[in-house]
């Protein structure tokens, strides 16, 4: 299912960020992740029928402009307010609590270990 895969990929982004932040802080590097919001994009454009109609309707009613979706990205890249914040999940330029699944340090460690293993299998090292 595409939606389940999409949600899992977002969970992995948060878990990976937490672990990367833990390691990067040793070198005074901060790492955060974010949710840009429900942005008007081509997401779901290949859906047809009732699902396609629902997605198009929701997009036209609730989605924000791309420029608005970029605000948190720009904020994290440029603001002094977040220069000492790392390993967090941001939404609307504020730290936001992710799902309980995203708070699981063991899952973050497992994802990191799997990522390293995949890289090694491809002949890459970190």
Predicted regions: what they are:
Residues 9, 33, 57-97, 103-109, ...:
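C-terminal helical subdomain
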Residues 1-29, 35-57:
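Catalytic loop of short-chain dehydrogenase/reductase
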Residues 24-29, 83-84, 120-126:
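Surface-exposed helix-capping loop/turn segments at secondary-structure junctions
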Residues 6-13, 52, 66-73, 123-126:
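Low-complexity, flexible helical/coil segments
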Residues 2, 101, 105-126:
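Non-catalytic terminal and boundary segments that flank Rossmann-like NAD(P)-dependent oxidoreductase
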Residues 39, 98-99:
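Glycine-rich, flexible loop/turn motifs
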Residues 17-21, 74, 112, 116:
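Non-transmembrane alpha-helical segments in soluble domains
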């Amino acid at each position: 299912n595409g939606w389940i895969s999409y949600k899992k990929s977002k969970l992995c982004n948060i878990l990976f960020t937490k672990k990367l932040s833990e390691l990067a802080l040793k070198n005074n590097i901060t790492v955060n992740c974010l949710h840009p919001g429900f942005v008007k994009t081509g997401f779901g454009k290949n859906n047809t029928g009732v699902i396609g109609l629902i997605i198009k309707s929701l997009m036209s009613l609730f989605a924000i402009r791309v420029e608005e979706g970029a605000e948190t990205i720009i904020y994290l890249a440029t603001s002094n307010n977040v220069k000492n914040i790392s390993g967090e999940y941001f939404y609307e330029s504020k730290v936001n609590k992710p799902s309980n699944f995203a708070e699981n340090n063991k899952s973050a460690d497992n994802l990191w270990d799997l990522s390293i293993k995949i890289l090694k299998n491809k002949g890459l090292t970190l």
